[in-house]
Amino acid sequence: MTSHLVGLAVANLCFLAAGAGVGRALGLWRAPRDLPGALAPVYLVGVAASGIAATWALVAGLELARWQVIAGCAALAAVGLVPARRAGLALPPPPPRPPARVVIALQVAVGLIVVLLLADAAYRPLSEWDAWAMWTMKAKAITLLGGLDPGLFAGVPYHHLHLDYPLLLPSVEAIGFRFMGAIDTQVIHVQAALLMAALLVALPRLLADRVPVVVAWASVLLIGVAPSLVDQASAGLADAPLAVFFAMAAVCGWRWIADGRREMLVLSTLFAAAVLATKREGTPFVAALILVMVVAAGRGRRLAAVGAGAAALATAVPWQLWLHANGVDTSNGEIPYSKVVDPGYLAGRLGRIPTGAASLVWHALQPGAWLVIVPAAAVAVVLAARGGERRTAVFVAAVACLVLVSVVWAYWVGRPSLHYYLQHSARRVVTTPVVLLGAFLPVLCVAASRGRRGPPVEPPA
């Protein structure tokens, strides 16, 4: 087990190196002294960029051998060496004063949660059906069969295993298997747990100039101890990584709207592309985010937001072309696209809408799963809107609601019974909007506390 953990650590160091190169080009750090404070967002950038590149490499016929991964990560790391115009750091500077005792206590608590999360992941068996039959199965197939073998990834006997789902998570796990030198389906759970841990550490840095540090760390502690997230982060499923990438895409997109830094728009595009490469549900999620960004950006920057959305969607084209070339049913038999605009078909299923929506809201509000993240965020949205921070409040509420609407739409038009959907997916599909609300909770709390003492944050002209 120890050697496998070391191998996985080496693979993640490659991701970190890739992220360091891309992150430096985007202003996450400039000098070596800046890097330690930016490690968490840099790591997430590295996994996102490497995962997307790995998917493209598989489509191109590569097998993700160790030398190929090292070469690819080295190429991404070299991006940081390209001379670029320096306009300061994209990340807000850390607080100049030493943290107060309460902040240190919160940081220690978050650190303890991270350690426990990683330990739980390292010893957790491969017991989730979707992980065993879909996500880790595909990672094993990539490793054992030397890439995308059409006999499996386009094979009729495997059609019920969602062959059309994107490959970022299986690709990243396959890289982990390569560096382990073995297929350890237990240790590999650490990979998704690392992504969640990185999000918890990255959010306070991304919001350092917007919220008091104590509020930021208290909020991520609330996210980190949410029972449902702890369970999913080490289960080998794609829902937690999807939520991580989407939260980063939304936070970076909001920062671009508020501050006008193009680097944040590029980061939002990268993480949106990672969302698309992680799970099929990511497509409507990204569409919802881009729509809200286009509306919120204002006249002068709407074209940039549209361009960012188009760039993110373009990254998914190679995988879609591979599916089409190999005759894979991209609806997997669940979504009858020919019926989507059939009034008779839709009218006969209207009863699914209130039932599905109510079930999703019920799961999101469960204190035994998500504590008080959703109620706290809902109250903060209302108070922030009444206090003058309408732009931020509407941005967060609109993205979260549109994400839920996209899930309800899938429940409405999908062929499987509504009972099947609610029993097998409802508790997981709310992960993305709940983590989104948790990521913005410190911003909303600060906005709500201001009342009408200050003007709302307006984007630069």
Short names for language-model regions:
Residues 219-220, 224, 252-253, 264-280, ...:
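Membrane-interface alpha helices of multi-pass inner-membrane proteins
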Residues 124, 288, 295-382, 402-408:
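Membrane-lumen/periplasm interface segments of specific transmembrane helices
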Residues 77-86, 187-210, 248:
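Transmembrane-helix motifs of polytopic, lipid-linked glycan transferases
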Residues 1-95, 446:
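Membrane-embedded, hydrophobic transmembrane alpha-helices
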Residues 174, 196-207, 294, 359-362, ...:
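Hydrophobic, aromatic-rich transmembrane alpha-helices
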Residues 205, 249-264:
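Membrane-interface transmembrane helices that cradle and orient dolichyl/undecaprenyl
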Residues 33-41, 183-186, 203-225, 258:
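Transmembrane-helix signature of polytopic, membrane-embedded enzymes
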Residues 96-101, 208-215, 260-263, 297-307, ...:
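Membrane-interface helix-loop-helix junctions at transmembrane boundaries of multi-pass membrane enzymes
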